[in-house]
């Protein structure tokens, strides 16, 4: 059997070949500049590598409206979240359709790409937040981003010529969809289960990963290394944790790890759909979706991110969810268990979550081995001790 097809049938990367990048950068440096937020820059990188196939740029109004209204592009393909480039009304007034603009990351001043403007349109920020995050609460980190950005969107195809240092920083672990597909094929895998994470792996994560590994040919550990919210553990620390976990507790023949540069939106259910779609592009047939996937705070119900998959027709999304219930360490079972399989009471359970682990470390407490593996806890202990200094 072959790997699943990319979303829309083919990969559509827009990252220029290496031999063209210097020339494109020189061209961009002579163009008017759009300074991008960290989220927009990370979306450029995802578009560049083809992770957001079939998209080849920032959404025009027709695609944007379809996504907001019914989670589908104008073509009819499923797509859950806006991929947009915002400017102020004052900026938009001097921008013409057909014009080329340089895309520059605002935080680093790195030139990332060029957009050819095909559309510019105003949008309703509150409507977008309610459609995307199911809330317009100003405390939601995704809402904060939308409400603070410009009032006009620019749509149009882009070409990128920078990966903003990720490929060097995570050498050997930073891969494009075409590369992971070739990797999976070389290993003889046709079914691949993705595991999305923004936390170091605790025992519950490991347990869920091994469920996915049992039912598919291979497991694809695919942590996010783009920007997270304040309080989340930095990517560099998590990366060391992932490597320690893989080296000591997984069969190297049936697991691969690569990282990706997207910024979390914390859009819960709709972000779970996006995670499935771009994992399909990376070659994955399945994705583990657990409790409160891609959530934040208490904005989403426990299994809302699983239920939303049922809103799509069969075949619309080829990367299918493996829906798993909350897992924990059961003292009577003397091992990991789930609500579905374990008959014992709450008093017998040691509930495990990334939030709980972070809270314990921040208080100077060392989580027990029921929470995490020794090698990982040692890395995290050093990190939290460095914060105290």
Curated annotation (Swiss-Prot):
GO BP terms: hydrogen sulfide biosynthetic process; sulfate assimilation
Enzyme Commission number(s) from the entry: 2.7.7.4
Disulfide partners: none
InterPro entries (UniProt xref): ATP-Sase_PUA-like_dom, PUA-like_sf, Rossmann-like_a/b/a_fold, SO4_adenylyltransferase_pro, Sulfurylase_cat_dom, Sulphate_adenylyltransferase
Keywords recorded for this protein, A-Z: ATP-binding, Nucleotide-binding, Nucleotidyltransferase, Transferase
Reactions it catalyzes: sulfate + ATP + H(+) = adenosine 5'-phosphosulfate + diphosphate
CDD domains for the chain: ATPS
UniProt keyword Nucleotide-binding, yes or no: yes
Family: Belongs to the sulfate adenylyltransferase family.
Protein name according to UniProt: Sulfate adenylyltransferase
Gene giving rise to this polypeptide: sat
């Amino acid at each position: 059997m072959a790997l699943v097809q990319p979303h829309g049938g083919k990969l559509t990367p827009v990252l220029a070949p290496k031999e063209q990048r210097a020339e494109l950068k020189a061209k961009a440096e002579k163009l008017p500049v759009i300074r991008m937020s960290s989220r927009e820059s990370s979306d450029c990188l995802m578009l560049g590598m083809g992770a957001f196939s079939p998209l080849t740029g920032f959404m025009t109004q027709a695609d944007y409206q379809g996504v907001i209204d019914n989670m589908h592009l104008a073509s009819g393909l499923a797509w859950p979240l806006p991929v947009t480039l915002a400017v102020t009304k004052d900026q938009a007034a001097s921008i013409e359709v057909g014009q080329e603009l340089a895309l520059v990351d605002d935080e680093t001043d790195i030139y990332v790409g060029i957009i050819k403007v095909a559309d510019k349109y105003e949008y309703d920020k509150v409507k977008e937040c309610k459609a995307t995050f199911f809330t317009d609460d100003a405390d939601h980190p995704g809402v904060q981003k939308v409400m603070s950005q410009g009032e006009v969107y620019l749509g149009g195809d882009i070409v990128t010529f920078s990966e903003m240092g990720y490929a060097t920083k995570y050498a050997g672990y930073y891969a494009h969809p075409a590369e992971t597909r070739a990797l999976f094929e070389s290993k003889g895998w046709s079914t691949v289960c993705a595991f999305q994470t923004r936390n170091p792996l605790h025992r519950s994560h490991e347990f869920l990963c091994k469920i996915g590994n049992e039912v598919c040919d291979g497991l694809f550990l695919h942590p996010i290394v783009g920007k997270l919210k304040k309080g989340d553990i930095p990517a560099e620390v998590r990366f060391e944790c992932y490597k320690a976990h893989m080296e000591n507790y997984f069969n190297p023949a049936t697991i691969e790890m690569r990282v990706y540069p997207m910024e979390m939106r914390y859009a819960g259910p709709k972000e779970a759909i996006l995670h499935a779609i771009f994992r399909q592009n990376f070659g994955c047939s399945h994705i583990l979706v657990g409790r409160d996937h891609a959530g934040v705070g208490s904005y989403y119900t426990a299994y809302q991110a699983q239920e939303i998959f049922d809103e799509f027709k069969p075949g619309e999304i080829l990367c299918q969810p493996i829906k798993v219930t909350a897992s924990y360490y059961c003292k009577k079972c003397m091992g990991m268990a789930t609500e579905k399989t374990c008959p014992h009471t709450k008093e017998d359970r040691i509930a495990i979550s990334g939030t709980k682990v972070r809270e314990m470390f921040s208080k100077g407490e060392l989580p027990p081995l029921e929470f995490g593996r020794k090698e990982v806890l040692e890395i995290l202990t050093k990190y939290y001790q460095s914060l105290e200094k």
